[in-house]
UniProtKB/Swiss-Prot annotation:
Belongs to the universal ribosomal protein uL11 family. This is Large ribosomal subunit protein uL11. Disulfide bonds: none annotated. It comes from Synechococcus sp. (strain JA-2-3B'a(2-13)). GO terms for molecular function: large ribosomal subunit rRNA binding; structural constituent of ribosome. Keywords: Methylation, Ribonucleoprotein, Ribosomal protein, RNA-binding, rRNA-binding. HAMAP family: Ribosomal_uL11. The gene is rplK. One of its GO terms (biological process) is translation. It comes from the Bacteria. Part of the ribosomal stalk of the 50S ribosomal subunit. Interacts with L10 and the large rRNA to form the base of the stalk. L10 forms an elongated spine to which L12 dimers bind in a sequential fashion forming a multimeric L10(L12)X complex.
């Protein structure tokens, strides 16, 4: 018989830097999960993505066991990494902080495609372009 699902916890954690400190400790502790076991597994699976924020969806079962699914990093983080900037513009439609080429946009869209609500790369590119615009980043051909 399948295990009974008790909770699904979604967190965005730095890759390879999960510790039992907040926000991870309290989020998992209230469900009785072994926090250190999660941290070790998460850090092992995300060691190759150092410096990125990797969202994770943790399914917690009745017997206090858990499974987790890693998602792709947020589009804004990928855009900032591609441009080498710290943050987006504080006034996105007035002050521009950089420009993204079509090739960079396609690369980010292909990386995000599994987690986006899009069926092809073109639609994913439009979604990423919208995120870029709201960050004060222009998209150039």
């Amino acid at each position: 018989m399948a295990k009974k699902l008790v909770a699904v916890v979604k967190l965005a954690i730095q890759a390879g830097k999960a510790t039992p400190a907040p926000p991870i400790g309290p989020a998992l502790g209230q469900h009785g999960v072994n926090i250190m076991a999660f941290c070790k597994e998460y850090n092992a699976k995300t060691a190759d993505q150092a410096g990125m924020v990797v969202p994770v969806e943790i399914s917690i079962f009745e017997d206090r066991s858990f499974t987790f699914v890693l998602k792709t990093p947020p589009a804004s983080v990928l855009i900032k990494k591609a441009l080498g900037i710290e943050s987006g513009s504080s006034e996105p439609h007035k002050t521009k902080v950089g420009s993204l080429t079509r090739a960079q946009l396609r690369q980010i869209a292909e990386q995000k495609l599994p987690d986006l609500n899009a069926h092809d790369v073109e639609a994913a590119m439009k979604i990423i372009a919208g995120t870029a615009r709201s960050m004060g980043v222009t998209v150039v051909d």
